[in-house]
Amino acid sequence: MPQYNDSVRSSDKQNWSASRISTYRQCPLKYYYTYVKKWRCSKAPDTTAADKGTCFHETVEHFKTGMEHAKLYEILESKIKEYNVDTTKYDEKAALERFFLFWNEFVAKSELTGFKTLQEGWASGDLGGEHFIGALDLCLDRGDRIKIFDYKSGKTPSISKYKDQLLLYSYLKGQERGWDFQQISDNVKLYLFFPMSEQKTAVTDEDKMLASVKEIKYDATVLQDCINNYLETIQEIKAHDWENEDLDALGCPDFACCWCEHKGGNPNAEGYKGCKASRDLGNVQERYVTYHLKESK
């Protein structure tokens, strides 16, 4: 997976990302614990669901047109062991087979028309003076045209919750060329690929692959509105007086709480306030679990 290194920027210039913004929009309390005070939990989070996606990503990032498929299967086997993926529950091999079909259709054919392929790269740029970064699973670039693909490991292909993330990427890549909103919407295409999605109506493997790829349609107005919303969210975050916030009122429990390390967390003497919203719903953290501040580098 890519490691971002931006040593040129001063240390007081914080990086923003789609995930950081979505964390705040989803739950301001989790944002506070993750980005403001950086509280960490002694209990290792359950990453079972995420590991299947990581296993896939860290396998396919090695692929290039013309590479023997057998080599990628070898990498997949090692990644399955590394992440202890339950292959009876998550069919990584079937996902890889679908990936090969995807690559032939969307990547290899594009390369024949002049597109250059970049896997696991970065997009970065400024939005209203705020520095944003984003990790790109796959970017096809011809200079005058760009295609961005993001891999998702969900069973159901859904565009809505990832749309803002991909729109941000399109803006950052277009900004590198000095394109305006109209030029970006004309020249940057956005796609989501769901290699593990269930396709019950598609007949052939090719059909299932095609049904697993979703294009995000947008125009200049949609893109501009999205970027403005990002900037408005940042201003809202900066307007918080975090040191004097009523943290009990910040929690926003929803389905995502099941993956949150702060679910059911109790206050401690070190200043950790826990999550009252999740405790009120009956969630209780185990007694042995503790919370501590992440050490500053």
Show the residue positions of the predicted features.
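RecB-family 4Fe-4S metal-dependent nuclease core
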Residues: 1-297
